[in-house]
Amino acid sequence: EKITTDVLARWKRLNGFNVHFSTGTDCHGLKIQRAAEKAGKSPENFAEEISDGFRELCKVLKISYDDFIMTTEDRHKEVTKLIINKLNENGDIYKGEYEGLYCVDCETYYTEKELEDGKCKVHNKPTEILKEESYFFKLSKYQEFLIDYIEKNPNSIWPEKKRKEILNRIKEGLKDLSITRKKVSWGIPFPLDGSLTTFVWLEALINYLTTIEYPDGSYKDYWPAVHIIGSDIVWHHTAIWFSILKSLELEMPRVVVHGFINLKGEKLSKAKGITIDPLELSKKYGSDALRYFLIREIPFGEDGDFSEEALKN
């Protein structure tokens, strides 16, 4: 992901474009909170360590970003507060109660039909039943807008098969989105009720506007943006993000989706010991060789198989 985005940013700069390449880490939510507890660390320190690891990786892989943002930063909290208040002023937020099946790793609620044998399809883990008082974003209000926009703008989501997947899912019907958490302490306090934290996938998406100084800074020079993302988070970056942007009367970005890297035909998994260490590979073969191999050998938008033998050859 970072290598692909870096290639695009370098190409655009060479062709005279004014580029703002941002990357970073979304640091909040139940997944981070629990991982920090397991490691015996505070969420702040745990998130900082993870972010330092990504910064080091970017340095080794020669990623030419202009801004590395952590969602724990004050600038991001301020923009998040501003945007939530705007959504509320626009009549797109209301208070209610939510009960649903929740995947901690995805930080997302799912319906039963979206699961496979009761497990999240992305992480292959059982979901938890959560019931709590919540504020909601009126996602259902934007269903017809989303269908119309995505159908009329074939380049809005690429590859085409991902655009069709999202479009078909939207046509099945949208439910309003729970945007607060009562049982999660590690997060940005919700502006309308400080006893709640903001849903991580609401505030994490806002980082794109934070890095370009929305609403008073240079954001008009760079928006709408290109988002290069993994196939596991397309829904959040399209159905949810496009609806928020429509409420804010902002243009939609173009969402470009990459696949996953597999190792000997199996998905990467720390738990199963199926891992690739890009830092070690860069030391062994050089970062330029690794960058070139990944860009050349794996068709963009598709899952690709990695082997060290193929890299050597």
Model-identified regions with their sequence ranges:
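Structured secondary-structure scaffolds
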Residues: E1-T23, R75-V79, K86, I129-N313
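N-terminal, positively charged nucleic-acid-binding surface of large information/translation enzymes
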Residues: E1-S156
